[in-house]
Amino acid sequence: GIAVSRVGTYPVGHTEMIDAWCGSNMMRTAYIPISWEEAKSKVDAWKSQGETVVFTNGCFDILHKGHITYLQQAAALGEHLIIGLNADESVKKLKGEGRPVNSESDRAFMLKSLRFVDEVVIFNEETPLELLKCLEPDILVKGGDYSVEDVIGKEYAGEVRILPFVKGYSTTQIINKILGK
């Protein structure tokens, strides 16, 4: 069994069950993000084993090199990376009409396909505050021009880390280039 092969109490997720039943080498064509409750259970299990849980969030609408570099750097800060992904309605409120370009299910699939991403959790609000209250990660990571004092939900993480933006990459720039602007 999956849980038996782990030290301590371990919640078996639906992705692990599919891997066990169908083989982990199968080509995935979909990913169902885990619920907040499943994510909390995993975070608690990882932390009980002394493993560091890193959390970041974003829209990740058109995944690009800047996103990948940022997520690799975030993942390197601990053993597990969880991404809070803005739901479609949240992205629309934050970014305006015509966004997101990619649906939340497609964005979640692309993020989960990255080997250094452990889980993706969708949130409907404009900020991840309630999700951070639920998960209480060891490290909360934000990108670019934030100051630690301005990070929403910092009180629910052990520490906050600010990583630099990768210059020259943004979803808005990609969209404008495609549109010939």
Predicted regions span which residues?
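Conserved post-catalytic alpha-helical subdomain immediately downstream of the catalytic base
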Residues: 1-19, 23
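Nucleotidyltransferase catalytic core that binds NTPs
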Residues: 23-181
